[in-house]
Amino acid sequence: MHQVGVGEHLLGQVLDGLGQPFDGGHLPEPAAWYPVYQDAPAPMSRKLITTPLSLGIL
């Protein structure tokens, strides 16, 4: 089974298609591992979005 490491250590990182940092740095051990292939969450079961995400595009 294919898994990907997730966690706050990825915030601000730019990764290539293999999950390696573009800057050549080292990623710390992930907080958790999630399977790559899994069922998508049910869209109607999540909370409604109430705050728009500002992207800076006019």
Swiss-Prot record:
Gene3D superfamilies: 3.40.50.12240
InterPro entries, per database record: P-loop_NTPase
Assigned keywords, A-Z: Plasmid
Induction context: Temperature seems to play the major role in regulation of transcription of the lcrE-containing operon of pYV, whereas Ca(2+) concentration has only a moderate effect at 37 degrees Celsius, and no effect at room temperature.
The protein's name in its UniProt record: Uncharacterized protein in lcrE 5'region
